[in-house]
From Swiss-Prot:
The lineage of its organism: Eukaryota, Metazoa, Chordata, Craniata, Vertebrata. Keywords: Disulfide bond, Glycoprotein, Protease inhibitor, Repeat, Secreted, Serine protease inhibitor. It is found in: Secreted. Avian ovomucoid consists of three homologous, tandem Kazal family inhibitory domains. This is Ovomucoid. Its main location: secreted. One of its GO terms (cellular component) is extracellular region. Disulfide bonds join 6-36, 14-33, 22-54. It comes from Leipoa ocellata. SUPFAM superfamilies: Kazal-type serine protease inhibitors. PROSITE patterns: KAZAL_1, KAZAL_2. Pfam families: Kazal_1.
Amino acid sequence: VVTVDCSGYPTHACTLELKPLCGSDNQTYSNKCGFCNAVAQSNGTLTLSHFGKC
């Protein structure tokens, strides 16, 4: 199981750093910040599928 530590999120500003992650919703998130904000909005139902683009 691949995991990402999302403690400290959500945050209001994310960098534009490109380190893509693929979520369980089959959506590519540009970086950990964007992914973790989406996890927070989903109340924890969104999980990491794998690192890299979907």
